[in-house]
């Protein structure tokens, strides 16, 4: 399968309106998670409601997926170095922090393609598109989820989905500090190095990458951002 040819059911000539939330301050993980849950519930109750996407940064924290193993934590979970959250996404442990862009699409996959595997591949392509715009070559590794540049993983992906409505999403390391990743085995992948885009492009900042991520999400999922009053 050529994932580069994956498309959604929605025509790019008729993009659907979606709300885009881009707070200018760091958003605690639990607040962003609550907002996604509320929007997911809104789509359950009002199926014709617009979809929504959050692009933001978190203060330092760690999250564990539904079935994630505590063996990938290199600290006592009762005394974590930063807040630790057990959440309703797939995947193992990951680290969020300033300098990392996260994108949380709350989409109704029945409006796109109701296939979680394809949705994960689309999120990877969102990141690969951004890297291409920056002149970097991103790639996926067989059997693994995420995006690598060279031997370094620069983007982690983990989603939750109920009744085909998604939450959680992707985390792209731009100019974040990497020390906190040493406290875990990121995504449960032993021997895989974590990287950040500024390692290849010194001086690159989140503000440089965020417009590209916004553009790639809109293009891949055929979304038109609804102006907010």
UniProtKB/Swiss-Prot annotation:
Superkingdom of the source species: Bacteria
GO cellular component labels: cytoplasm
Active site: 187
Protein EC: 2.3.1.181
Reaction catalyzed: octanoyl-[ACP] + L-lysyl-[protein] = N(6)-octanoyl-L-lysyl-[protein] + holo-[ACP] + H(+)
Keyword Acyltransferase belongs to the record: yes
Pathway of action: Protein modification; protein lipoylation via endogenous pathway; protein N(6)-(lipoyl)lysine from octanoyl-[acyl-carrier-protein]: step 1/2
Listed PROSITE patterns: BPL_LPL_CATALYTIC (PS51733), LIPB (PS01313)
GO biological process: protein modification process
Molecular function terms from GO: lipoyl(octanoyl) transferase activity
Residue ranges of domain BPL/LPL catalytic in the record: 47-225
UniProt binding sites for substrate: 89-96, 156-158, 169-171
Site (Lowers pKa of active site Cys): 153
UniProt keyword list: Acyltransferase, Cytoplasm, Transferase
Subcellular localization: Cytoplasm
EC class name: transferase
Coiled-coil region list: none
Family: Belongs to the LipB family.
General remark: In the reaction, the free carboxyl group of octanoic acid is attached via an amide linkage to the epsilon-amino group of a specific lysine residue of lipoyl domains of lipoate-dependent enzymes.
Record's function text: Catalyzes the transfer of endogenously produced octanoic acid from octanoyl-acyl-carrier-protein onto the lipoyl domains of lipoate-dependent enzymes. Lipoyl-ACP can also act as a substrate although octanoyl-ACP is likely to be the physiological substrate.
Name of the protein this chain belongs to: Octanoyltransferase
Organism whose genome encodes this protein: Synechococcus sp. (strain CC9902)
Gene designation per UniProt: lipB
């Amino acid at each position: 399968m050529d994932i580069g040819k994956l498309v959604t059911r929605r025509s790019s000539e008729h993009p659907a309106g979606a709300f885009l939330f881009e707070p200018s301050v760091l958003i605690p993980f639990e607040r962003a998670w609550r907002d996604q849950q509320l929007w997911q519930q809104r789509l359950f109750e009002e199926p014709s409601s617009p979809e929504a996407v959050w692009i933001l940064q978190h203060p330092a924290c760690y999250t564990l997926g539904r079935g994630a193993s505590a063996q990938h934590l290199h600290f006592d979970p009762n005394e974590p170095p930063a807040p630790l959250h057990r959440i309703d996404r797939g995947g193992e442990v990951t680290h969020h922090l300033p300098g990392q862009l996260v994108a949380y699409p709350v989409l109704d996959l029945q409006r796109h393609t109701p296939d979680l595997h394809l949705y994960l591949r689309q999120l990877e392509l969102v990141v690969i598109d951004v890297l291409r715009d920056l002149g970097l070559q991103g790639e996926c590794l067989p059997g693994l989820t995420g995006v690598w540049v060279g031997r370094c993983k620069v983007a982690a992906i983990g989603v939750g989905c109920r009744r085909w409505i998604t939450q959680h999403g992707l985390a792209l390391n731009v100019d974040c500090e990497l020390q906190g990743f040493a406290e875990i085995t990121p995504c449960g992948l032993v021997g895989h190095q974590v990287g950040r885009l500024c390692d290849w492009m010194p001086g690159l900042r989140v503000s440089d990458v965020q417009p590209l991520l916004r553009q790639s999400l809109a293009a891949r999922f055929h979304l038109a951002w609804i102006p907010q009053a």
